[in-house]
A protein has these predicted regions:
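Short helix-initiation/N-cap motifs at beta->coil->alpha
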Residues: 65, 80-91, 138, 172-186
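Ligand-binding clefts/hinges and TM-proximal coupling segments of bilobed small-molecule sensing domains
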Residues: 23-24, 157-172, 210-214, 243-266
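Flexible hinge/capping segments at coil-to-helix
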Residues: 131-148
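Ligand-binding cleft/hinge of the Venus flytrap
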Residues: 51-55, 68-77, 140-144, 155-175, ...
Length: 266
């Protein structure tokens, strides 16, 4: 069923069953998407394996780039990518700068107060990156010690998690692109905290970097897509999309291509 026919059916059913809800249907993001024939998708273009823009070619790649394009195909519309970041996520979504944010967004209590999430499609624990030459950090237990500097990106889920977890180490919160990586490479910080997708791609491209993994589960976070609250119709359509890409194998195929099959949520 085309997007226009789907919307018409929803309007008809809502008007018959609940006349007061008809306006809600026509005010849905789906109505705007159908009208302009494009869905606006917020991404963080520095997210390796998820929504990464190659600085040389400007080409976008990653599992959520693939899934955004699949969403456009399912809706029968084009896809317009909108640059965002974790620091700007809530503002961009709630101010309607995009219809949906699709960059493996960790579902946290703070974000859940402001945004509405789909069911998760990925889930990742937290990992650390240090330099191969760092003598202070030999394993995970060396991170939370006096004198250690731990870098995180502002607005990421790692900021509140590490604020609550660290007891002895110093937390350094940075809000410019690749600042945490530069702090570690320069030696001003000992480690930066990240997730599985980013760590795998980063290690493949940074000869100086070394992965530090937790000995067991540290803080696994589900990743999902996020929209502005109050649009039940758009949320239901996205939930159907997430269920579809899990069932028909599109999500797993893309995850395998980008080396992320281990963190697909089932």
């Amino acid at each position: 069923m085309s997007l226009h026919r789907l919307l018409a059916a929803l309007v008809f059913v809502s008007t018959i069953a609940h006349p007061a809800l008809a306006q809600n249907v026509t005010d849905s993001h789906l109505q705007r998407i159908a009208a302009v024939k494009a869905v606006r998708v917020c991404i963080w273009p520095d997210y390796y394996s998820i929504t990464y823009r190659n600085p040389r070619t400007q080409q976008l790649s990653g599992v959520d780039i693939d899934m955004a394009n699949e969403l456009g195909k399912d809706l029968g519309v084009g896809v317009q990518f909108v640059d965002s970041s974790f620091a700007k996520l809530i503002e961009d979504v709630t101010q309607d700068h995009c219809d949906v944010a699709m960059f493996a967004i960790g579902v946290t209590p703070l974000r859940a107060e402001k945004l509405r999430f789909t069911k998760p499609h990925l889930a990742s624990d937290i990992f650390a990156i240090t330099t191969k030459s760092n003598r202070r950090i030999k394993g995970w237990d060396d991170i939370d010690k006096s004198g250690t500097v731990v870098a995180v990106a502002k607005g990421t889920l790692h900021e509140p998690v590490m604020k609550s977890k660290l007891k002895a180490a110093q937390l350094l919160v940075l809000d410019t692109p690749f600042a945490r990586e530069q702090e570690v490479q320069s030696g001003r910080a000992d480690v930066f905290m990240t997730d599985y997708p980013y760590s795998q791609r980063f290690l493949a491209n940074a000869e100086w970097a070394r992965l530090v993994s937790p000995p067991g589960e540290y803080h696994v976070t589900p990743y999902a897509y996020a929209i502005k609250p109050g649009d039940d119709i758009w949320h239901a359509r996205l939930e159907r999309f997430v269920a579809d890409i899990k069932r028909d194998g599109r999500l797993l195929a893309s995850a395998k291509q980008h080396g992320l099959s281990l963190i697909v949520a089932h």
